[in-house]
Amino acid sequence: MKLSFLDPLYARPGPWAAVYLDTSRDIEDPEKAIELRWRHLRDALSGQGVDNATLSALHTAVGSDREVSGRHGQALFAAHGRLGLAEELPEPPAADSARFTSIPDVLPLALQHAPDIPYVAVALSRAFAETDLEEDVVVHYQAGRWPMSRVAPEPRYNHIGAARDWPANAFAVAHELENLRRWTDAETIVLRCAAEDVWLRGVLVNHLPESTQQHVVTVPDSGRPVAGPGRALLEAELNDTLRATVNEQDRTLTHRYMAQRARHPDTSEGLSAAITALQRGQAHCLLLTRPVNLPESLWAGPEPTHITLMEPDLHSFGVHTGRQEPAGAVVVRALVGTGAELITVPREELSLEDGVGVLLRYHDPYT
């Protein structure tokens, strides 16, 4: 998974105030609940030395996701009186948190972006026209990147036409779907239709290129709404289909990692090996097992590659005034700063020393 969405947070210096809070709308009086949550977090930040201008910038953003229904959260980052990044979270944080650190505490946000699968969702159904008893074919479709699109959906497109004209209309819809798939590099098309509408599905899929047809996954029409306010089209069906998968790039990198580990186990897994690779700019990607179990903190210097387990180790970089920072923040800064990627895998699928593995850009024969 590429981490370029975090670039704005490294474009200007900290310290950064990072807030993760539950902003779910599936409770009674959510505005009051969010206000109370924010009040506690604001007090915590104030106690950590956050200035009033930065607190004000965060206050303006808290709860601004009112158009998103259901369970979700927010991740907010601000420094020097300016909001640096605000994102909705598909899952509310297990516990609200507020930290004021030199390096932005972004690992919880990065983990919610995974597995970052590009897709196109299609809902295909029949409906009776309002003016007569003639049936219409109704198509809704939308691209996205799972799972962040659950709460930050892309534009939705719609097509309604007479069922008798479907063979001709399906050609145009298939053309639009293929263009959308190519534009977004979608790896799968999740198509929902009723069992009795197999003909509608067949006509549509047969108009897609053969290379695209093999990426179509058909799911039954459960009768659930195609989407809630501010939510992704076919969210429930996408969750069932994509929650246990990874994107194609991450799958390829994981296979490469397994081959590397078989040849060079000592430099391929464990926190120490990963830190060494990050110090050298040698890491192509970092693998973390879920749930993530990094230490509470690491030592950091002013540059992304200044990352160590112990403070004296910073001296080799000429750094004599290092600081302890949240381990996840230091690791992700090193990944972004060296152009490395992040992959998360369930612990039961891949056992790694310290829950950490590193795929190297090159192997140093002297290590």
Question: Which stretches of residues belong to each language-model region?
Answer:
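Terminal alpha-helical anchor/extension segments at protein ends
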Residues: 1-367
